[in-house]
Amino acid sequence: MAHQHDTGTAAAAAGKTAIHYDFAQIQAKWLPVWEKLKPFATDDPEDNRPRKYVLDMFPYPSGDLHMGHAEAYALGDVIARYWRHQGFSVLHPIGWDAFGLPAENAAIKRGLDPRGWTYDNIAQQKASMRRYAPSFDWDRVLQTCDPSYYKWNQWLFLKLYEKGLAYRKASQVNWCPFDQTVLANEQVVNGRCERCDNLVTKKKLTQWYFRITDYADRLLDDLNQLEGAWPAKVILMQRNWIGRSTGADVQFAIEGREEPVAVYTTRPDTLYGVTFMVVAPDSELAAELAEDARPEVKQRFEEYLAAVRGTTEMDRLSTEREKTGVFLERHAVNPLTGESIPIWAADYVLSDYGHGAIMAVPAHDQRDLDFARAFDLPVRVVVDTTQPATGAVPVIKTDPQTGEPLLPESAPLESPAETGQALTGEGRLINSGPFDGLSKSNAIRRVTEALQGSGLGAPAKNFRLRDWLISRQRYWGTPIPIVHCEACGEVPVPESELPVLLPPAEGLDLQPKGRSPLGAASDWVNVSCFSCGGPAQRDTDTMDTFVDSSWYFLRFLNPNDDTRAFDPREAEKWAPVDQYVGGVTHAILHLLYSRFITKVLFDQGFVSFTEPFTVLLNQGMVLMDGSAMSKSRGNLVKLSDQLDAHGVDAVRLTMSFAGPPEDDIDWADVSPSGSAKFLARAWRVAHDVTSAPDVVWKSGDPALRRVTHRFLADTPGLVEAFKFNVVVARLMELVNATRKTIDSGAGPADRAVREAAEVTTMALNLFAPYTAEDMWARLGYEPSVSLVPWRKPDPTLLIEEAVTAIVQVDGKVRDRVEVSPKISVDELEALARSSEAVLRSVGDREIVTVIVRAPKLVNIATRSRS
């Protein structure tokens, strides 16, 4: 509990002297006090209070803090400070996501070492962050570019490698020609690099992957645990990205090839409608089939493949583009019908979907139909979409002469080959032999059973999710702890040899060239094999920086421990994170990777939980004039200018009051100057209090006490529902009520005024800590108000005063009833209609209209019954 000043209240000494709210003076006064007191440290082993872990997504050190940072850290701090007031020990740390391309590119542009550039930016941001005053535990700071951190990235890599979850393979990868490095699928947005916005191409490289697809089912199914605790939009985005589908793997024999080709399909019921096969031109199967083709076919294929490699994935999947392809002059065999079908290579099939080959059913798939029409391939309808898809299965009779099925009469089917529109709706199978008349679900089951019985297929699942490509051809990242030995192959670096330090950048050409600059550091690259002692070379790629952030929440538990990544006992105490705050831009990348790594650590016994973040809050963006802020648009608002002009607390309060936290804030529409005026008004309330700190409040003004205690009762629910703007609005009402009591009511000496001022101060601490701390001192207490328990409301003060509702019948008052001021229109009308006085007055007359003005008036109009 905070201690009282021996000198009594500052306000009493000040008397009626005019005072001025000086935010700069207040900030200068309290920041060094907090630095000395460390009120937010969480290193006391004897602290047995319940715990909360509140974490903001850590920033990237590219320049100073901006308006987006200001919003995120203001909102996260509301939550951290709230839980401290609720009696919790709160872990609220901060660090820097310090590796990565932006720092490396900025350093190259300026001719600097990425280390110096990064650490200078961290120092600048740290100073700005301290000024902004989030309630961070500054003894738990980390930077991911420190060897003391990335040593444990390498440890994590080795743990995945031991379990076969980290592996290296050659494949077609996403390639950013500007940054000259590979990208994970999640880092490609609409065919462009999510960092530099350049078009992404494909390139065949040998790269390192994490086997996240092994966890696809769990990553999808465990989203159910997060329903209601994470934004629905984020959960939907992850579900769609993981993209589980069910169907069958169907084996198609290839004429002239010993091994069949597996084709994944969600619609095995349409097998009778397959008229050709399409393979991805950049797949190994296409290359193999083209290799055995005639020279002119092989040449056409190679020319086509070269063109495809210059096409973005988005363009390849577009339904608007003209379909292109090459006939490979090879044929496959339909496993159900025995029909020979031609094999084409076409760019609308991707090598990493299913098995890189599809069975084309042009009558019932639009892209297949577009391709079939472009190359005059047959179109066979096998689903009658005019037949009901559900209900009783129709009895299928056969023509006694031809043996052909006689289906129930229905509207004539239009030919997709003529209309250009595929029949994608539900219906009944036709032209499908023994499966005619079956609905989609029954046909899928029956066809799959038939394939399985003959060894030509089996039920299967497929995922949109691909393994996480984690190697990068750049300098500023975590070195991969593997050496390559001609005799032994891949050899992991022993844990005792970690960290594998980055070599100095001096002397290395960091300009992007498509290969890692580390390859030129010969003294660093060439080492002895840890297995046989022979010559070996270090792996020269560095890790994707999303590896760094996938587990950083655990490193905060003991960031200075050089013996382990984190202490499992501390993880039991603090983790998982109770409240995570950050932008929706990380809905897939960071959050999905963190969920994956957490499950890996769970499986290996390092943690006892499977989800890293219990509750997630995504804040909106800070805009200017309806657009994202940028120098090029000329609408950039500098945070430092706003802090200088209005003060830290006014900016923080504005961020919380502007609207629901998940909504965007347009800085042109808000008023930090208005926030500053409110803070001055609240601050003067504390200054004007003249009663002593130890007064008994019960004898204070009852009306003000009711306002105060209603605020005390309602605020916890509002904060926990993230309705920070509503809390601020209610706080303004409390300040106004207190001011009114001081100026025209019971006066500044009234005990209820002190109570209201103290509650105002505690609540204001959530949003404006400098002002709140100064108010707390003016009220006669020692710092810090942050550690003061939230007051419990008096239930007797929460009982609403009744109001008198007048009930009129035909303009005459017939009854008066005492009701709640919050009574609804329907409730008040029902109460009036049931009044005995009203019933007597109405008698047998007909009620024509009832006008209700809740909570004070009901007017009933009647007329004689004819």
Swiss-Prot record:
Residues that hold ATP according to the record: 631
Placement of sequence motif 'KMSKS' region: 628-632
One example of a Gene Ontology biological process annotation: leucyl-tRNA aminoacylation
Superkingdom of this protein's organism: Bacteria
Main location: cytoplasm
SUPFAM superfamilies for this protein: Anticodon-binding domain of a subclass of class I aminoacyl-tRNA synthetases, Nucleotidylyl transferase, ValRS/IleRS/LeuRS editing domain
Pfam families referenced in this protein's UniProt entry, alphabetically: Anticodon_1, tRNA-synt_1, tRNA-synt_1_2
GO MF annotations in UniProt: aminoacyl-tRNA deacylase activity; ATP binding; leucine-tRNA ligase activity
UniProt keywords, alphabetically: Aminoacyl-tRNA synthetase, ATP-binding, Cytoplasm, Ligase, Nucleotide-binding, Protein biosynthesis
Gene Ontology CC annotations of this record: cytosol
Low complexity bias: start-end ranges: 404-418
UniProt family annotation: Belongs to the class-I aminoacyl-tRNA synthetase family.
NCBIfam families per record: leuS_bact (TIGR00396)
Name assigned to this protein: Leucine--tRNA ligase
Gene source species: Leifsonia xyli subsp. xyli (strain CTCB07)
